[in-house]
């Protein structure tokens, strides 16, 4: 299981990569392992939509369970990974790369301070085992 040091994480297993004012969001390697084989991805927000931290941005279904993906920081949706619903298996094979879900222009960068760094996220995972 990988936890990239350059990302921030939520306690609910989402990640965000910040580049300037743009945040790219997806789910963690740990989350995809827990869900098992992802068979369905539905991104439930639209480009141009303003979404608040904690709102659902996607629904995932696996052979074991269904899960919602929540936005780690508020922003305006500037890009959606349109390929993901056609290739949901990428969530398992490349959760930090090709399986990004949306990109947002961050509207409240202070919310990032509430997220976990890689070490804190790894500690949270260890507590769950």
Model-derived regions: residue spans:
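Short connector loops at helix/strand junctions that flank enzyme active sites
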Residues: 64, 70-72, 96-99
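Aromatic- and Lys/Arg-enriched surface recognition patch
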Residues: 78-102
């Amino acid at each position: 299981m990988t936890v990239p040091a350059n990302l921030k994480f939520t306690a609910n297993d989402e990640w965000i990569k910040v580049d300037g004012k743009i945040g790219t969001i997806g789910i963690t390697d740990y989350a995809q392992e827990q869900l098992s084989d992802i068979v369905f991805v539905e991104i439930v927000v639209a480009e141009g939509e303003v979404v608040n931290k904690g709102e659902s941005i996607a629904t995932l279904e696996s052979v074991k369970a269904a899960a919602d993906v929540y936005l780690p920081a508020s922003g305006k949706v500037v890009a959606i990974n349109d390929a993901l619903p056609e290739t949901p298996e990428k969530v398992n094979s490349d959760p930090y790369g090709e399986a990004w879900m949306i990109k947002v222009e961050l509207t409240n960068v202070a919310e990032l301070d509430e997220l976990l760094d890689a070490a804190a996220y790894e500690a949270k995972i260890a507590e769950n085992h």
